[in-house]
């Protein structure tokens, strides 16, 4: 299903007449330009390739610059591909605006979560801590046993342990659209979304 690419601006709050408020995330969605249309005949699958924003030519790889030049599209800040079943309805150079979400109520949003470095099991997996007193020495945040005995004799793959937290591609589903500002090209989404301020965000109509 086709979606759009936006940039996370940050979070704010919207107030209502009933003296209530909700937290919202502001996402800037500039016009998305279709770069390449992939078809079953040429590529064995259907999708469209989009770009948005602007990037200086000297900061673009020659191969990437040649790709934009081939389809006669101005250089954007990146390339994103969305699989779809009706790619023939689009053409290179076509603009897709924020009004694409005009009649849609909920979105699935994908981004790269904030990296938090090396984290223990309490922070990474929400493990409970061990006793604070009663003879506990230096084992307040340790995970405990990670295996069994001589059989099986190894730690199972996927065992929840300490390690790198964050900086992963993450999707949050069914986020409600609060407001669409087509003049400033900003969409307000209820709640928080993955990613740091200024990061690229993928927005798709909700599949649920």
UniProtKB/Swiss-Prot annotation:
BP terms from Gene Ontology: translation
N5-methylglutamine: modified positions = 150
Q: Which PANTHER family match?
A: 50S RIBOSOMAL PROTEIN L3, LARGE RIBOSOMAL SUBUNIT PROTEIN UL3C
Keyword Secreted in record: no
Could you tell me the superkingdom of the organism this chain comes from? Bacteria
Record organism: Buchnera aphidicola subsp. Cinara cedri (strain Cc)
Q: How is it modified after translation?
A: Methylated by PrmB.
Pfam hit, one: Ribosomal_L3
Signal peptide (from-to) = none
Role played: One of the primary rRNA binding proteins, it binds directly near the 3'-end of the 23S rRNA, where it nucleates assembly of the 50S subunit.
Q: What is this protein called?
A: Large ribosomal subunit protein uL3
- Provide the gene name from the record: rplC
InterPro entries per UniProt: Ribosomal_uL3, Ribosomal_uL3_bac/org-type, Ribosomal_uL3_CS, Transl_B-barrel_sf
- Subunit architecture: Part of the 50S ribosomal subunit. Forms a cluster with proteins L14 and L19.
Give UniProt keywords alphabetically. Answer: Methylation, Ribonucleoprotein, Ribosomal protein, RNA-binding, rRNA-binding
Mention any one GO cellular component term assigned to this protein in its UniProt record: cytosolic large ribosomal subunit
Q: Name one GO molecular function term.
A: structural constituent of ribosome
Similarity comment: family membership: Belongs to the universal ribosomal protein uL3 family.
Q: What is the lineage of its organism?
A: Bacteria, Pseudomonadati, Pseudomonadota, Gammaproteobacteria, Enterobacterales
């Amino acid at each position: 299903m086709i979606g759009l690419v936006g940039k996370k601006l940050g979070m704010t709050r919207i107030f209502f007449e009933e003296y209530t408020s909700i937290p919202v995330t502001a996402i800037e969605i500039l016009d998305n330009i279709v770069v390449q249309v992939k078809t079953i005949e040429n590529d064995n699958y259907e999708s469209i390739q989009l770009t948005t924003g602007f990037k200086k030519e000297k900061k673009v790889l020659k191969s990437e610059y040649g790709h934009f030049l081939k389809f006669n599209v101005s250089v954007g800040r990146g390339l994103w591909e969305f699989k779809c079943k009706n790619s023939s309805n689009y053409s290179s150079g076509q603009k897709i605006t924020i009004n694409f979400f005009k009649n849609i109520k909920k979105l699935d949003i994908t981004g790269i979560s904030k990296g938090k470095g090396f984290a223990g099991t309490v922070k990474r997996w929400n493990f409970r801590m061990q006793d604070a007193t009663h003879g506990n020495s230096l084992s307040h945040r340790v995970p405990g046993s990670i295996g069994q005995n001589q059989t099986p004799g190894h730690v199972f793959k996927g065992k929840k342990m300490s390690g790198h937290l964050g900086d992963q591609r993450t999707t949050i589903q069914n986020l409600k659209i609060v407001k669409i500002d087509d003049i400033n090209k900003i969409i307000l989404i209820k709640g928080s979304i993955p990613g740091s301020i200024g990061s690229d965000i993928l927005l798709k109509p909700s599949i649920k």
